[in-house]
């Protein structure tokens, strides 16, 4: 009996040992198959990205650069510049996140490489209402099986994000940035423009305070920023290549961008962020606003561009949504109204030139889109928009005027907003405005 039991026990041990060996073989085969299909796991990439955010927060340059291929000197230099620039910026949040599943794997030695879209998710302390993002394409490689993963290439994404890609940001564009902060403004400029940032920061601060006070006095509901991010550039080339890659020379003296909030696709719908999380202003110093003969010029353009930035946060439709395009006469007229310090629109510096245009055959009109390629037409269009907002404020009051602006930014058409807020049709408003303007400038 004892012999039988011993034989059975021995058989069980042998069977278990055989099964264990077979399981090891199956596990190894499964692991090999998984590695062949997925040689660089998303968990590894996420851990690498988390480490980048940690290194930036701790100002650990060595750790930040450790993930990049040391053989690629240009890449290491690029990322060294980026790290040192980012370290100067007051971020409330700054993390790197993987977007999507990445490209197909490509063989590399005994390993593989893959491309991933990486979002630099950030929130400027005191200036952004919600986190925003800038997107890059990273090439991540493992040159040999079992070896570490390294980043071998990084490039900014400039396509598929509408008119403005939000790349390159100042920290990408310039080797050395200067950051100048006031209570309500944050200048991020090329270090070569440090003196100009320091010179104009007080004027921008006064412009921000004036605009915020005007909006507050209007009593319109809605979350707006209490600070504004500004970059100064010299010339149209830089104006058209910061936060965007302009195909043509930009005609404007300054631009304000509403920056989309970073949207976590895994978040519940009731936790989705508003469409616009912040704004960025870029102003060209090589324009008449900054000539010695125009002492009020800097304040005028700061108030104008910050007016756009202030109400951008109210946006409640996608930027590329063409169902309710914004009427330029209203948005630019509002910016001109605040830019002119809410003074009578007839005091506008554009008025003398407009009178000449009208006497030479141009006509009054409220244009939904300005012809920026025709300077005389554009000047008249800005002036007409300004006069319309001035008329609206004079007849209906600033609060109603600001409500019209807010509702239009929230996605309502002008033809619907005017009856709703002012109890007047667009056609009747236009007729009354035109009659009013002709009487004022005759």
What is each model feature region?
Residues 1-24, 73-76, 81-88, 376-380, ...:
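Beta/coil-rich, acidic/histidine-enriched accessory regions frequently appended to metallopeptidases
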Residues 108-123:
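A short hydrophobic beta-strand element
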Residues 297-301, 306, 316-398, 402-442:
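Acidic/His/Gly-enriched intrinsically disordered linker/tail segments
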Residues 181-320, 414:
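Juxtacatalytic substrate-recognition/specificity segment
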Residues 61-110, 418:
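Short solvent-exposed beta->alpha transition segments
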Residues 23, 122-176:
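Short beta-strand edge/turn micro-motifs at domain boundaries
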Residues 3-58:
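Short, low-complexity N-terminal intrinsically disordered segments enriched in polar/charged residues
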Residues 35-39, 51-53, 186-202, 285-297, ...:
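Second-shell loop/turn segments in exported
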């Amino acid at each position: 009996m004892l012999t039988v039991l011993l034989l059975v026990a021995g058989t069980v041990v042998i069977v278990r040992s055989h099964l264990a060996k077979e399981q090891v073989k199956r596990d190894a085969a499964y692991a090999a198959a998984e590695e062949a299909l997925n040689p660089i796991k998303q968990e590894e990439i996420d851990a690498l990205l988390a480490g980048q955010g940690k290194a930036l927060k701790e100002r650990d340059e060595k750790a930040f650069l450790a993930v990049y291929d040391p053989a690629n000197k240009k890449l290491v230099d690029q990322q060294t510049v980026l790290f040192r620039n980012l370290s100067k910026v007051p971020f409330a949040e700054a993390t790197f996140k993987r977007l999507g599943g990445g490209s197909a794997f490509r063989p590399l030695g005994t390993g593989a490489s893959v491309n991933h879209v990486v979002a630099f998710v950030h929130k400027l302390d005191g200036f952004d209402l919600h986190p925003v993002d800038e997107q890059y394409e990273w090439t991540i490689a493992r040159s040999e099986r079992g070896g570490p993963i390294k980043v071998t290439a990084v490039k900014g994404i400039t396509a598929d994000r509408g008119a403005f890609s939000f790349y390159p940001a100042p920290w990408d564009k310039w080797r050395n940035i200067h950051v100048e902060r006031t209570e309500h403004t944050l200048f991020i400029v090329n270090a070569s423009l440090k003196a100009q940032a320091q010179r104009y920061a007080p004027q921008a601060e006064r412009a921000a305070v004036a605009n915020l006070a005007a909006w507050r006095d209007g009593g319109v509901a809605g979350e707006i920023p209490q600070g504004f991010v500004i970059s100064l550039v010299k010339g149209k080339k830089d104006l058209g290549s910061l936060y965007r890659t302009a195909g043509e020379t930009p005609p404007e003296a300054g631009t304000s961008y509403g920056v989309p909030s970073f949207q976590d696709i895994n978040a519940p719908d009731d936790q989705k962020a508003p469409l616009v999380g912040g704004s960025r202003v870029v102003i060209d110093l090589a324009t008449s606003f900054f000539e010695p003969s125009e002492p009020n010029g800097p304040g005028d353009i700061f108030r104008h561009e910050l007016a756009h930035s202030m109400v951008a946060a109210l946006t409640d439709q996608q930027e590329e949504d063409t169902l309710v395009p914004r009427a330029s006469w209203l948005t630019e007229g509002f910016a001109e109204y605040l830019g002119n310090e809410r003074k009578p629109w007839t005091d506008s510096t554009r008025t003398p030139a407009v009178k000449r245009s009208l006497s030479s055959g141009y006509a009054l009109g409220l244009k939904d889109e300005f012809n920026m390629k025709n300077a005389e037409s554009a000047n008249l269009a800005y002036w007409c928009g300004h006069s319309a907002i001035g008329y609206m404020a004079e007849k209906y009051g600033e609060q109603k005027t600001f409500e019209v602006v807010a509702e239009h930014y929230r996605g309502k058409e002008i033809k619907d907003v005017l009856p709703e807020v002012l109890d007047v049709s667009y056609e009747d408003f236009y007729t009354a405005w035109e009659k009013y303007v002709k009487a004022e400038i005759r």
